[in-house]
Amino acid sequence: MLYSDKDIRVAIDAGELGIEPFDADLIQPSSIDVRMDRLFRVFNNSKYTHIDPKQQQDELTSLVEVPEGEPFVLHPGEFVLGSTLEKFTLPAHIAGRLEGKSSLGRLGLLTHSTAGFIDPGFSGYITLELSNVANLPITLWPGMKVGQLALFKMTSPAQAPYGSNVLGSKYQGQRGPTPSKAYLNFR
């Protein structure tokens, strides 16, 4: 079941769904808008000859914090990691799906590459996989609406929600754009 605006408000008021900072104006008919944080991870193209998911490549990306009042410029063909301004905490019976904003998609901004699903039990800031498929640079302003999170009630709560000890949830509690930890899947 997809949550409506009413369902989202009820879940927040009941303390089931955590959103910090919360702004009621972000609630849409069947989703909640998410805003861009000021932290980005850019790829260091000169440090590695290639990306190997099996290897821990700590210097593959560098953290960039955009100064107050300034944008981040995403160039054509560029891929960076961003983060939501909001921290989300989902209970064991609610899953989420992050989607881009139509108005930004029409400008060539992709909000995520493949990782739009948010598991029940997740708590943290959502990492955005930002790509510019336009032929002009796009300015990304901290605080701007960049996506929307649709919420789904599961038929029953997850027995082992994200963050459970049995799962080895690599991104639980993440703050800011978190680089890939794919190498942990090979251990």
Curated annotation (Swiss-Prot):
Q: Which UniProt keywords apply?
A: Hydrolase, Nucleotide metabolism, Nucleotide-binding
Binding of dCTP: at which residues? Answer: K101, S102, S103, L104, G105, R106, D119, T127, L128, E129, Q148, Y162, K170, Q174
Gene Ontology biological process: dUMP biosynthetic process; dUTP biosynthetic process; nucleobase-containing small molecule interconversion
Q: What is its EC number?
A: 3.5.4.30
Active site per UniProt = E129
Q: Which domain of life, per UniProt?
A: Bacteria
Q: Does the keyword Nucleotide-binding apply?
A: yes
Subunit structure, per the record?
Homotrimer.
Q: What is this protein called?
A: dCTP deaminase, dUMP-forming
What are the top taxonomic ranks of the organism? Bacteria, Bacillati, Actinomycetota, Actinomycetes, Mycobacteriales
